[in-house]
């Protein structure tokens, strides 16, 4: 499939081609009196005392409804009639630079600027330097006074394309005031002024009249919040040098040239041998390829999404007042905060990736795959180590040990995670306020009210000087410090945690992508003779049949399904019958389609699709930076084996990385292009951006420089036509334990142990239901369900219930014990069913695994951790008091006693399949494994596998359990994978309900009728069809025509006459058209067996008649004489006997 797509060439019909010619950015002006500042404040990252911050790019909040997210940005004039354009997407942020005081800070704690500046200097990262005064006066809002009176009072923000952020940073974009236009943004009338690159006016004689947009606050924000984060991902401390390299790449199309090697630093322990030299080269090439490919991935045109429509967010439905809208935004911010928590509290966060490392060689030989020898290493301890330039000269002396708290996480590390930006740090702290603290057992002196009333309100605090101890970041850090990871340098190849948004299609059921036939269908366009019965169809059919039986409704239990012991047994026996029947049909379908299911089951996976579209990311600057970091980390991880193999063929001993790159980088760039996309992890498409119109509308440049607008026609030339656009990143989780060499150490976590006989019921699949329906099963019972069934398991004794028949109790106990014991002996799914549908799925998948021969090892299961809001008293959450002062502990407790705060915690009880369909925000650990293809294929492929979180403070659900009724003593965390999920559907997205997805009632009737007809062993099949029609249609059966029966019965329409005859008989008799009435009428007539018919085998019965000889006339020369007498034969002779008549064989 990939080769066919590559042979077809780049796609010309794409979002880049469809983009219109336009400017490089806009300056937006919003009226301060009608702009929703309270709502916008909850979406921004303004810190206390800040003057510049960002808001997300959202139509209805910051841009107009018809804003186009892609543009062919004009940046140069090639000749008087031709302009050069660059196709690009707009940056997801609107940087507000005027009248920021109208907004409320997202975090009230002061001193963030000083903390970030001190941390930046401590870790050796370059500081922002404001541009010296240029020749031209920079643009100011007052310059628009003749066009827009009172422009200085407007809230102003700047929007820029991804390809021209560096030009905005350097103040090289020109404000074309003559093209100001009015737009409707939400409920306010705003204005926007286009920004064009200064190179467009390079030959204009009126250049002195131009107003270049340069705002030191905007440039500082880009430097700290965006470029420093990129520098951390690329292991570069020289941020200005990196910005210059990115400008050369984007503006001058230097994608195939090395650019960043002059800015790079390396550990001071390097350059001592061939191994260290190889590591330095691989590290350098990984950075260069990440800049050339990773950053180009981030600037290509992308498809717009429904997430950008702020005025259509479902969370605002039912909100009648501004306060309710603010509360709705707060609730959603709390839910997405768990993803920021997991990144900050995980020791293997993508924010803490510090260097490229090489695994030590295995002494025993035959170690790990050589392609995985280089890996992305994490560990905050690496930040404190000294570094040097490629020529060996010292660059960074390291962090003094006295400046940090040993191996303890500090505020400086939190500032590093926020890229030393006070705006980003404020947003991080806002999310941390929703986190619940976990007190360490070694921290006996931990007491939040005492800390606020004694230590935090003194001038010793360097940030707030005791003026606002409740909202100070030191107080927040004290409350949560036990959850932060230790500061250590890892030497293992551990996964790293990524955050983004999942795609619409994920294989997250228990058996994952088993029997989906997707790959086979993509490779072959041949139509199948038989309809394939996929695994998804099986689970869907089971759910539908449970719904028809009145047991489930959309995966949720029906409340009145169980009301006594009889109904309890009926429900579970009905579930067992439905599941066992569907499993048998599914297995038979695979046999008919020649599916080798016993082998294919060994390679099934859960699959999560990470969407590589920036407009699918949550509208928050923290998540935007996390998306950039994740893409760059994965691109570097993918390229490591390519760099390693090329360096081995072209060793760099005695040559500096810069000189080596100048000789080999273009070859590496070309090689990586073929090994980056569609090799297992990243899927993407190569765009060819074209402009189909020969001329387009533009304006006269010289007139614009004079402040006039004169329309003209111009030709367009694309500066960079070919673009590689990533689509999704596939993360897989292997379900069946491989038991391959090298996995012996983790085998104990997967091998199935023998369950103890005295705990099979308590740890079995029915205990959840026995506890939930305890009062219905045993009315008036005072004994707890746990004690009742634990006593029964150990002593086989049951109490006497006066209101319950003894026979019913005995039947229930025998059923539960027998099936619990059978489940414990055969189940390889370590999941406790939460509802009837989960019970059915566990039983179904256990049957499938058993049919495929998988009984020895537990299957790996995947669970989602979804956020739940909990309102708690504010006594231990001091930020509820805001920026007010506190004199002592008593005053603090008195002020906090009447307050409550929303907090967030996670639950693992939600159905991951249903959550996965809701476009969730996902946070998960992954490790990229590399391997080669079949013998003779030298291509390197990759696979992103689901990993594990490092750190006990990530979430309490991830702490290894030590339950009383564990099936075995080893940890189950190795076979249980977890993913943090926050659904966007019903929050920021409306559920897409297509017309074809909503079934008509007649479709359900047709399906149920044909299920009955497909059962060839049912002697009452016609009667059951009539009963089903009466049950579904009622009195409408009187008007059922032959055409209706043709639809309902499908291929079984040949029996429609029998069904029509019985319906007519019922119609003639008349009645209430209930199922009981129809059964009473038809039950007496339908008794075909009657105990009188006897069946015998065909070969044992005497053949009473044969075809006439002329029906099988033989050629005259081949005719043979006939003899009397017949002979009974079997097998192949039977056919010949029928054809040749009485011929004696």
Curated annotation (Swiss-Prot):
Region (Required for nuclear localization): 1115-1145
GO cellular component, one term: host cell nucleus
Superkingdom field: Viruses
Keyword DNA-binding: yes
Record keywords, A-Z: DNA replication, DNA-binding, Host nucleus
Compartments (UniProt record): Host nucleus
Gene Ontology MF, one: single-stranded DNA binding
A single BP term in Gene Ontology: DNA replication
Pfam families according to UniProt: Viral_DNA_bp (PF00747)
Subunit structure: Homooligomers. Forms double-helical filaments necessary for the formation of replication compartments within the host nucleus. Interacts with the origin-binding protein. Interacts with the helicase primase complex; this interaction stimulates primer synthesis activity of the helicase-primase complex. Interacts with the DNA polymerase. Interacts with the alkaline exonuclease; this interaction increases its nuclease processivity.
Family classification: Belongs to the herpesviridae major DNA-binding protein family.
Functional note: Plays several crucial roles in viral infection. Participates in the opening of the viral DNA origin to initiate replication by interacting with the origin-binding protein. May disrupt loops, hairpins and other secondary structures present on ssDNA to reduce and eliminate pausing of viral DNA polymerase at specific sites during elongation. Promotes viral DNA recombination by performing strand-transfer, characterized by the ability to transfer a DNA strand from a linear duplex to a complementary single-stranded DNA circle. Can also catalyze the renaturation of complementary single strands.
Protein name: Major DNA-binding protein
Organism: Equine herpesvirus 2 (strain 86/87)
């Amino acid at each position: 499939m990939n080769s066919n797509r590559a042979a077809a060439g780049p796609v010309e019909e794409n979002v880049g081609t469809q983009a219109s010619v336009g400017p490089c950015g806009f300056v937006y002006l919003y009226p301060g009196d009608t702009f929703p500042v309270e709502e916008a404040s909850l979406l921004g990252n303004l810190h206390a005392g800040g003057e510049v911050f960002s808001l997300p790019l959202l139509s209805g909040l910051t841009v107009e409804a018809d804003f186009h997210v892609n543009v062919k940005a004009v940046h140069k004039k090639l000749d008087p009639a031709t302009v050069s354009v660059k196709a690009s997407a707009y940056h997801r942020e609107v940087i507000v630079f005027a009248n920021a005081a109208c907004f409320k800070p997202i975090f009230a704690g002061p001193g963030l600027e000083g903390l970030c500046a001190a941390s930046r200097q401590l870790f050796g990262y370059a500081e922002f330097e404001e541009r010296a005064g240029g020749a031209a006066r920079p643009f100011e809002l007052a310059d628009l006074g003749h066009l827009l009176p009172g422009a200085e009072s407007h809230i102003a923000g700047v929007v820029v394309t991804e390809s021209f952020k560096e030009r905005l940073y350097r103040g090289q974009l020109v404000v074309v005031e003559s093209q100001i236009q009015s737009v409707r943004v939400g409920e306010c009338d705003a204005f926007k002024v286009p920004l064009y690159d200064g190179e467009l006016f390079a030959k204009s004689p009126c250049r002195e009249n131009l107003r270049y947009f340069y705002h030191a606050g905007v440039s500082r924000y880009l430097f700290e919040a965006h470029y420093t984060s990129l520098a951390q991902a690329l292991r570069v401390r020289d941020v200005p040098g990196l910005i210059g390299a990115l400008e050369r790449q984007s503006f001058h199309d230097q994608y195939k040239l090395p650019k960043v090697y002059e800015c790079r630093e390396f550990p001071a322990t390097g350059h001592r041998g061939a191994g260290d030299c190889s590591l330095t080269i691989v590290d350098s090439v990984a950075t260069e390829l990440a800049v050339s490919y990773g950053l180009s991935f981030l600037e290509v045109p992308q498809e717009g999404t429904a997430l950008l429509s702020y005025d259509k967010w479902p969370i605002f439905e039912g909100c009648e007042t501004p306060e309710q809208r603010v509360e709705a935004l707060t609730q959603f911010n709390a839910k997405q905060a768990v993803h920021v928590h997991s990144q900050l509290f995980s020791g293997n966060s993508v924010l803490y990736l510090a260097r490229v490392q090489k695994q030590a060689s295995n002494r025993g030989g035959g170690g790990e795959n050589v392609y995985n020898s280089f890996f992305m290493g994490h560990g905050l301890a690496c930040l404190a180590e000294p570094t040097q330039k490629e020529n060996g000269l010292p660059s960074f002396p390291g962090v003094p040990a006295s400046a940090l708290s040993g191996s303890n996480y500090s505020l400086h590390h939190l500032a590093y995670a926020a890229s030393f930006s006070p705006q980003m740090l404020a947003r991080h702290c806002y999310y941390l306020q929703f986190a619940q603290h976990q007190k360490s057992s070694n921290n006996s002196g931990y007491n939040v009210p005492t800390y606020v009333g004694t230590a935090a309100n003194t001038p010793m605090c360097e940030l707030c000087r005791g003026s606002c101890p409740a909202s100070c970041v030191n107080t927040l850090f004290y409350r949560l410090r036990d959850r932060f990871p230790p500061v250590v340098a890892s030497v293992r190849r551990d996964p790293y945690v990524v955050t983004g948004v999942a795609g619409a299609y994920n294989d997250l059921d228990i058996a994952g992508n088993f029997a989906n036939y997707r790959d086979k269908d993509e490779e072959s366009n041949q139509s199948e003779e038989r309809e394939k019965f996929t695994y998804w169809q099986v689970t869907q059919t089971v759910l539908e049949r449970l719904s028809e039986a009145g047991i489930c409704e959309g995966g949720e239990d029906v409340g009145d399904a169980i009301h006594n012991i009889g109904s309890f047994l009926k429900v579970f026996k009905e579930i067992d019958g439905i599941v066992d029947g569907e499993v048998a049909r599914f297995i038979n379908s695979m046999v008919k389609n020649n599916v080798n299911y016993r082998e294919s089951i060994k390679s099934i996976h859960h699959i999560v699709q990470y969407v590589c579209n920036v407009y699918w990311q949550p509208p928050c600057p923290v998540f935007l930076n996390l998306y950039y970091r994740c893409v760059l980390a994965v691109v570097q991880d993918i390229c490591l084996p390519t760099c390693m193999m090329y360096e081995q063929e072209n060793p760099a001993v005695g040559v500096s990385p810069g000189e080596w790159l100048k000789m080999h980088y273009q070859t590496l760039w070309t090689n990586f292009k073929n090994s980056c996309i569609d090799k297992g992890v990243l899927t993407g498409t190569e765009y060819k951006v074209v402009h189909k119109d020969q001329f387009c509308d533009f304006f006269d440049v010289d007139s614009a420089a004079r402040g006039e607008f004169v329309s003209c026609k111009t030709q367009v030339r694309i500066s960079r036509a070919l673009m590689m656009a990533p689509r999704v990143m596939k993360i897989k989780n292997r379900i069946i334990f491989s038991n391959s060499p090298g996995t012996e150490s983790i085998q104990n976590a997967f091998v199935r142990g023998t369950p103890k006989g005295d705990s099979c019921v308590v740890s079995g699949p029915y205990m959840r239901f026995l506890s939930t329906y305890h009062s219905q099963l045993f009315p008036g019972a005072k004994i707890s369900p746990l004690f009742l069934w634990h006593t029964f398991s150990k002593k086989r004794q049951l109490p006497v219930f006066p209101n319950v028949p003894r026979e019913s109790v005995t039947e229930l106990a025998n059923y539960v014990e027998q099936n619990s014991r059978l489940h414990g002996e055969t189940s390889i799914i370590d999941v406790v069913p939460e509802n009837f549908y989960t019970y059915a799925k566990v039983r179904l998948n256990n049957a499938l695994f058993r049919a495929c021969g998988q009984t020895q090892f537990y299957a790996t299961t995947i669970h989602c951790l979804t956020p739940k809001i909990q309102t708690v008293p504010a006594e231990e959450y001091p930020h509820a008091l805001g920026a007010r002062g506190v004199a002592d502990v008593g005053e603090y407790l008195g002020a906090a006693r009447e307050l409550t705060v929303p907090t967030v915690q996670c639950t693992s009880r939600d159905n991951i399949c249903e959550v996965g369909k809701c476009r969730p925000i996902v946070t998960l650990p992954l490790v990229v494994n590399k391997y080669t293809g079949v013998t003779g294929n030298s291509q390197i492929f990759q696979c992103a596998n689901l990993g594990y979180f490092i750190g006990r403070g990530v979430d309490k659900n991830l702490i290894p359990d030590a339950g009383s009724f564990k099936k075995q003593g080893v940890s189950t965390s190795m076979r249980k994978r977890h993913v943090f999920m926050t659904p966007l559907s019903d929050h920021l997205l409306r559920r897409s309900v297509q017309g074809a997805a909503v079934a008509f009632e007649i479709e359900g009737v047709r399906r149920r009728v044909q299920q009955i007809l497909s059962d060839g062993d049912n002697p009452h099949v016609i009667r059951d069809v009539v009963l089903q029609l009466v049950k579904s249609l009622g009195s409408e059966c009187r008007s059922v025509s032959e055409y209706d029966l043709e639809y309902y019965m499908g291929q079984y329409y040949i029996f429609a006459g029998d069904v029509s005859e019985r319906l007519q008989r019922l119609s003639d008799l008349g009645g209430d058209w209930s199922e009981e009435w129809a059964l009473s009428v038809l039950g007496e007539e339908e008794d075909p067996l009657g105990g009188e018919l006897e069946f015998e085998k065909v070969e044992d019965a005497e053949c009473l008649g044969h075809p006439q000889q002329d029906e099988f006339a033989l050629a005259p020369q081949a005719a043979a004489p006939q003899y009397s007498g017949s002979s009974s034969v079997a097998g192949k002779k039977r056919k010949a006997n029928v054809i040749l008549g009485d011929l004696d064989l």
